[in-house]
């Protein structure tokens, strides 16, 4: 196809057509759509796109790929994807500041070969990986400040080590940097590392940074700064005039000792740095402290392994070495052959100065040297290690003798190869044998010269494990502990000595012995606390239950005994009339009831007596007429007892409230003054208890009850009361008067007559009173 006029004009445009072509290109550029809410400035020959504060959540996909400057600041972009900046080969300046970027895809900037400035400050980046900044071979300015970066990979800056001029990593969480990579940035002008957690700067980092004009290490955790020609250059030393250099390291906990003396000798105009340690220089201005106060202390070894370490060949050993000084000493170890030891498959040096030898060999026998060094000097301490070679055990027999118990033993015994003879066995004695220990004795080995130590090896006949014990050559006894009870053991003692012929350690059997530990008797252990507590609870509960049962049994017996008596009394008193007004009477000074005296003939009262017969009890009541004329009242019960303990009689007496006529009425037949019996009347009788043998006397006007001051209460009740429920007051004064009296004229009142009053014995009265 032949080229048209337009294409030929582009290939060789005449001078008169140049303005027209510029306008045409601008029109074509304006034909590319601009993303919404963005500002596109097409000023030839550059294309600038401004999308600041537009609320973008991601990089707009409609961005012109020919853009030269792209600013996406103050948005909400959370991630940078691989396709966001693809094919933007003309992009020179990219600003992504003040977003929420936390992820950057690998190779996201790989097509930005012309990019000179990348601003990713004020985002949420946590780390910088080596594949994230790949392809930025022309980068000059990298701004990563005010993020959350904790780690930077060593290969992260490899793409622009020779081109970068400005590196900003301030306000992050960095504890370390790839100082080796930083030292290769030969065109670096500004290094900003302030407000991080950096506590160490590798020595020689700034040697090649001849173009560095500003180093900001403010507010980190630096204790010291390594000597570097960078700082010397700022003082004007050298053949070339110095480049202006500003170094800021204020806000660091500087340890002002001899290691910072080189920095103190420099001339500085600022006076912002202070010392944190040592204590006598705390909070003092660094540049105002005299040089003679920047001191160091030589190391002093404070703790080391014992003067001699004994270890069996093949076992591990640890050699400790501690040192103090200012600055803190560094510990190194030197092997017996003069080699400087480091970390290897067999040895390891810890940070605290401990040397671990995992597998010892015969070459390790000798003196190890601990060297502690710092800026003020060094200190050494020897540690001797003695490696005991493994004993040369005899080969196992072709046909081992049968064992009484299952198991095997590889100890040389008199009946097996490797043992000397029966005399060797006799030289070894097992004494003080218990269930878990035994004391082994053997004589001195004079025929064997140069004995270095003794080796005791033993095991049980049912155990395949062989136990070794190394003891000094001066010992002739050994106490073996931690044995199992009731088990047979084979034990041999070997002497380790130097064989002059081979110059190697050799062993010789001193003797062997077989023994059986005692059985483990069942120990008598005291009862535990919770067992004693349970026993006490059971015992106390048993006592309480027994007491309750005894109390119940006593109540049942008492109820049965007194319940039968109450029932008999109730049966005998069912026919008695209703009574009231209780009064207590005693026979006063009466001495007994051997013979009951008769009532006087002139008395106006007649006593009623209960006549008992063998067929059925009959009650004969005798009444006497009363002179007083009183109203009719209910019968009254009067209980009395003689002081001499005589029986108490049950009689009927008229109540005080009864009238004269009604009181004269008798229940049963009565005698007239002439002695003749008269028929009974229909008036109800009055029941009372009078003391047997007591003379009849007029009834007192004042009543008394068995309960003392509760007489009125008894007077207000008209229901009958049992005689056993009442109390007896023997101290009533007006009832203890002259009580005897002469015997009545009536002979029927005597004790010898066939008719007898119903009486309560003294024993029954006391039982009833107790209840």
From Swiss-Prot:
Residues 32-65 form the LRRNT domain. The chain crosses the membrane at residues 537-557. Disulfide bonds join 321-370. Glycans are attached at residues 87, 343. GO terms for biological process: regulation of postsynaptic density assembly. It is found in: Membrane; Synapse; Postsynaptic density membrane. Residues 252-298 form the LRRCT domain. One of its GO terms (cellular component) is plasma membrane. It is a single-pass type I membrane protein. Residues 424-520 form the Fibronectin type-III domain. Residues 1-31 form the signal peptide. Residues 719-732 have a biased composition (Basic residues). Residues 558-771 are cytoplasmic. The modification Phosphoserine is found at residues 613, 718. PANTHER family: LEUCINE-RICH REPEAT AND FIBRONECTIN TYPE III DOMAIN-CONTAINING PROTEIN 1, SYNAPTIC ADHESION-LIKE MOLECULE SALM. This is Leucine-rich repeat and fibronectin type III domain-containing protein 1. The lineage of its organism: Eukaryota, Metazoa, Chordata, Craniata, Vertebrata.
């Amino acid at each position: 196809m032949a080229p048209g006029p337009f294409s030929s004009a582009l290939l060789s445009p005449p001078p008169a057509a140049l303005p027209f072509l510029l306008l045409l290109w601008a029109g074509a550029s304006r034909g590319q759509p601009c993303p919404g809410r963005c500002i596109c400035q097409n000023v030839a020959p550059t294309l600038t796109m401004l999308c600041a504060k537009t609320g973008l959540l991601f990089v707009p996909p409609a961005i012109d790929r020919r853009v030269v400057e792209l600013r996406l600041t103050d948005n909400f972009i959370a991630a940078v994807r691989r396709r966001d900046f693809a094919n933007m080969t003309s992009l020179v300046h990219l600003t992504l500041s003040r977003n929420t970027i936390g992820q950057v895809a690998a190779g996201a900037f790989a097509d930005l070969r012309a990019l000179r400035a990348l601003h990713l400050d004020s985002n949420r980046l946590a780390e910088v990986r080596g594949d994230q900044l790949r392809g930025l071979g022309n980068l000059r300015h990298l701004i990563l400040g005010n993020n959350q970066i904790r780690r930077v990979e060593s290969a992260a800056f490899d793409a622009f080590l020779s081109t970068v001029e400005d590196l900003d990593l301030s306000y992050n969480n960095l504890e370390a940097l790839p100082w080796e990579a930083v030292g290769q940035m030969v065109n670096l002008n500004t290094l900003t590392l302030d407000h991080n957690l950096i506590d160490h700067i590798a020595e020689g980092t700034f040697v090649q940074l001849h173009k560095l004009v500003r180093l900001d290490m403010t507010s980190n955790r630096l204790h010291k700064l390594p000597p570097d020609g960078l700082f010397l250059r700022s003082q004007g030393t050298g053949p070339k005039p110095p480049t202006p250099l500003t170094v800021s390291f204020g806000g660091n906990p500087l340890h002002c000792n001899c290691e910072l003396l080189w920095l103190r000798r420099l001339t500085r105009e600022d006076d912002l740095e202070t010392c944190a340690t040592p204590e006598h220089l705390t909070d003092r201005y660094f540049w105002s402290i005299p040089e003679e106060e920047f001191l160091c202390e030589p190391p002093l070894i404070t703790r080391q392994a014992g003067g001699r370490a004994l270890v069996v060949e093949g076992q591990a050993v640890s050699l400790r070495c501690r040192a103090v000084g200012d600055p803190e000493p560094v510990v190194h170890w030197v092997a017996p052959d003069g080699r400087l030891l480091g970390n290897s498959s067999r040895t390891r040096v810890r940070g605290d100065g401990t040397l671990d030898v995992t597998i010892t060999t015969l070459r390790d026998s000798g003196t190890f040297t601990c060297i502690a060094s710092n800026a003020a000097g060094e200190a050494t301490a020897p540690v001797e290690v003695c490696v005991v070679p493994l004993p040369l055990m005899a080969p196992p027999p072709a046909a081992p003798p049968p064992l009484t118990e299952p198991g095997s033993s590889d100890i040389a015994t008199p009946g097996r190869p490797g043992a000397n003879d029966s005399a060797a066995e006799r030289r070894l004695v097992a004494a003080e044998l218990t269930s878990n220990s035994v004391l082994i004795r053997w004589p001195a080995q004079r025929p064997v010269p140069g004995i270095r130590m003794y080796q005791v090896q033993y095991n049980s006949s049912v155990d395949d494990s062989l136990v070794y014990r190394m003891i000094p050559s001066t010992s002739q006894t050994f106490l073996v502990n931690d044995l199992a009870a009731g088990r047979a053991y084979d034990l041999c003692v070997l002497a380790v000595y130097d064989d002059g012929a081979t110059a190697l350690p050799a062993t010789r059997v001193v003797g062997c012995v077989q023994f059986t530990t005692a059985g483990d008797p069942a120990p008598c252990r005291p009862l535990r606390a919770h067992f004693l507590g349970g026993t006490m609870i059971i015992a106390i509960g048993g006592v309480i239950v027994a007491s309750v049962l005894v109390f119940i049994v006593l109540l049942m017996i008492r109820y049965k005994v007194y319940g039968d008596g109450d029932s008999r009394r109730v049966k005998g008193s069912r026919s008695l009339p209703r009574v009231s007004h209780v009064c207590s009477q005693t026979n006063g000074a009466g001495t007994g009831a051997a013979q009951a005296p008769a009532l006087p003939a002139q008395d106006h009262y007649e006593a009623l007596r209960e006549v008992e017969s063998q067929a059925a009890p009959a009650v004969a009541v005798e009444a006497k007429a009363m002179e007083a004329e009183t109203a009719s009242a209910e019968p009254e019960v009067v209980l009395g007892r003689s002081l001499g303990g005589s029986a108490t009689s049950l009689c009927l007496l008229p109540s005080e409230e009864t009238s004269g006529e009604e009181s004269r009425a008798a229940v049963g037949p009565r005698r007239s003054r002439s002695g003749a019996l008269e028929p009974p009347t229909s008036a109800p009788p009055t029941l009372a208890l009078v003391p047997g043998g007591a003379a009849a006397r007029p009834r007192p006007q004042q009543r008394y009850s068995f309960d003392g001051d509760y007489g009125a209460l008894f007077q207000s009740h008209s229901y009958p009361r049992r005689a056993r429920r009442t109390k007896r007051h023997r101290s009533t004064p007006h009832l203890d008067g002259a009580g005897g009296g002469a015997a009545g004229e009536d002979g029927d009142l005597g004790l010898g007559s066939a008719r007898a009053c119903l009486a309560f014995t003294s024993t029954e009265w006391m039982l009833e009173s107790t209840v």
